């Protein structure tokens, strides 16, 4: 067995009663007033009013910031940090999906000097952020459990990350009831993000017995409940499975990184403003197929967890069956299978930049050395082109 380390400091609270969960979180942190950050989409939903009502009923003071953008930029995040510094809030609550939670984490600027660009990379944050409570309203990004902030840099037109233990949420509040009546597209998009975290971590070279155990349980919950939850958004058991699966899958990603689905996806999503889950839905089958031979034992195990009859199959055949099943799940969820339909074009210059990002992410940062098969620049460009055109994976 190889040496490994496992990092987890976030306190997870699973509570189907939002008011009760918030009261517990406030008591643990000993705080009085929160800046709550969300995006206009969530602010238009009934759960936003439920959140404010719950805060009032427990006498938890708050200010609101409702201007979070999807795929938040450095500009938006710094505006949020400035808004926080202008208040007397002693804690921050991120309420929403990964964008709201990452923007809430960017409150680090309230206790650290300079701009976000000063902290790109790992372990550059010097001071602890204000206490944070992350209340997720989607089951996908798992941003509430990571030490990372994903940022679209407006100058570089690519996604950057800040990584630091100081960026870990103090409390992650998981309330499945908040997922009720989630739009089908949001649920499918977020769920595929969780699936990609799980699978890329499981087959990665940094995987260890702890992350493997989590991954198998997460994979079981997602393949059992994602499609059901998309089709039956009021199913509280399916919602519980998915909110936990997303949370747990990111425990994997935050410890051992992801793979080339994320490495290529960060370049495409940041450059063309496509949601992270959708980007991964298009890319993941291609990346799994690229790795199928070196990752055959683990992908074969995934096939069995999915209920695929692997009797009489070789390990490689079972692994290939798993890849095809993941592709079929993507299609059953009615997620996009190509980038071309977004009206985007990929030029030779774009392909070089995609290869630059993927190559860099394979060498630097949380996912460095994690991909099971070492890809070349030409491999990355070929995967991007196949994904752009929606080439169907086959064996």
PLM regions with names:
Residues 43-115, 123-124, 228-239:
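N-terminal small/polar loop signature for handling phosphorylated ligands or for N-terminal nucleophile
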